[in-house]
């Protein structure tokens, strides 16, 4: 059995009971080393296999092979495993290799949901997720999606917004959005949601400071109706009040 588990954004309080129970039931836990530290309370003396960044295929293949050997394996992924996580890669590998492995997918709280709850209620109407990482998706494709989302007036949740190797991507995204969104459009940023160094702040499309944003950040750009009241970012659902 291979359980692909979304462990949420980092706080044990934001993990589902199903995820906790699956971790406790597993014989072996496989994951990115940073994420294995986040679930230490549930792994005890279990065997924990840690890998570094950019070794996702190796990590998933190891988990699959251990499950094939008869072990109860937990492969952990931050947030929800089916949103920029390991779930799809596991299913692709199992399908491509025509393997007979029981795979169970356990949902978790994705970063946008955790961030939204800290900022107010910015996702009350239609929204989309866009990752600014171009490691697996060509940047021109990402740019087209940003433009389309802006023109459609979606609230936009930017994942993987800025790293040492991609310092200009978020600024470029904001430049593209300036063609369809007002400079006064509210923007919310949350860093390390649910973790010890959690931070949050509100700004606007025109006043955004990109420097503090990193890979632990989630950036939410509002739509034409989004506003800030009493320090809370709100996107109206459309009720007549």
Curated annotation (Swiss-Prot):
One of its GO terms (biological process) is cobalamin biosynthetic process. It holds the Pfam family TP_methylase. It comes from the Bacteria. GO terms for molecular function: methyltransferase activity. Coiled coil: none annotated. PANTHER family: COBALT-FACTOR III C(17)-METHYLTRANSFERASE-RELATED. This is Probable cobalt-factor III C(17)-methyltransferase. It comes from Salmonella typhimurium (strain LT2 / SGSC1412 / ATCC 700720).
């Amino acid at each position: 059995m291979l359980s692909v588990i979304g462990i949420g954004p980092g706080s044990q309080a934001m993990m589902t009971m199903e995820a906790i129970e699956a971790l406790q039931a597993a014989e072996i836990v496989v994951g990115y080393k940073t994420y294995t530290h986040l679930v230490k309370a549930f792994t005890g003396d279990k065997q924990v296999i840690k890998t570094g960044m950019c070794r996702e295929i190796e990590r998933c293949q190891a988990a699959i092979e251990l499950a094939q050997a008869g072990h109860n394996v937990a492969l952990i992924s931050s947030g929800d495993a089916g949103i920029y996580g390991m779930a799809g890669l596991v299913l692709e590998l199992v399908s491509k290799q025509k393997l007979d492995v029981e795979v169970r997918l356990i949902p978790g709280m994705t970063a946008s949901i955790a961030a939204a709850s800290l900022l107010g209620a910015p996702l009350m109407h239609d929204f989309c997720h866009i990752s600014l990482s171009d490691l697996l998706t060509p940047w021109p494709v990402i740019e087209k999606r940003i433009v389309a989302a802006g023109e459609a007036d979606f609230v936009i949740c930017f994942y993987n917004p800025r790293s040492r190797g991609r310092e200009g991507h978020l600024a470029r995204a904001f430049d593209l959005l300036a063609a369809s969104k007002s400079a006064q459009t509210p923007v919310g940023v949350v860093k390390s949601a649910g973790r010890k160094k959690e931070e949050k702040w509100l700004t606007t499309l025109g006043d955004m400071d990109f420097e503090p944003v990193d890979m632990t950040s989630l950036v939410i750009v509002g739509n034409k109706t989004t506003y800030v009241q009493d320090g809370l970012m709100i996107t109206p659902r459309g009720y007549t009040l």
